[in-house]
A protein has these predicted regions:
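Cysteine-dependent hydrolase recognition
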Residues: 1-200
Length: 200
């Protein structure tokens, strides 16, 4: 849980007795601060003090659950994913989504360049993959300042099946970009047969 102090409405009334908090970096008020679970996988003696040098001894991850029912659903999904019964050409599809940035933050094209570098690396290393690019600036902006066609394209691609979806840009815990092209509500309301790996 990211809210170690319990100040957000999201964690009000949550029992803390069985919560495993994230590791928080020392520079917690700095722009270089971060939260990670990697710390819990540094099992060698004297490891864990240098994250760029130390090696994790096992893979770690979290299930965002609060109930036994949610835990059962997540375990069942993981087992299904690992059994790899849902094979098909969808596993050759990868999508890169890039924010447009703006003049105020001077990131006008940085996100697209970063996403393009990743996409080109995939195309070079794995030529069998079909790389989809959803870059905001390639779509029409609505009069409300949003990108409805970007949202629709992401949804269409997810329904067709993606091995990976990578987002490069600004966002928060509840949405991608200040235009909110993909939100927590979208995720909560979605149900896709093919489960991609999400990278943001």
């Amino acid at each position: 849980i990211y809210d170690n102090r319990g100040i957000s409405g999201e964690v009000q009334g949550v029992s803390w007795s069985n919560m495993l908090l994230t590791f928080q970096s020392q520079e917690s008020l700095n722009v270089y601060s971060y939260a990670t679970d990697d710390y819990f996988a540094f099992l060698e003696d004297n490891s864990g003090s240098n994250f760029s040098r130390d090696k994790m001894c096992l893979g770690v991850g979290r299930f965002p659950i609060r109930t036994v029912t949610e835990a059962t659903q997540m375990v069942d999904k993981t087992i299904s994913y690992m059994e790899n019964k849902d094979s098909g050409s969808w596993k050759n599809n990868v999508t890169f989504v890039a924010d447009d940035g703006n003049n105020e933050d001077s990131f006008t094209t940085n996100h697209m360049k970063q996403a393009d570098q990743l996409a080109e690396a995939i195309e070079e290393m794995q030529p069998g993959f079909l790389v989809n690019k959803v870059y905001f600036d390639a779509y029409k902006r609505s009069s409300l300042g949003t990108y409805p066609d970007v949202h629709n394209e992401i949804e269409k691609l997810l329904k067709s099946g993606q091995l990976l979806i990578n987002y490069t840009g600004h966002g928060s815990t509840t949405h991608w970009a200040d235009e909110s092209v993909w939100t927590q509500t979208d995720i909560n309301n979605s149900s896709y047969k093919h489960l991609p790996v999400w990278v943001t």
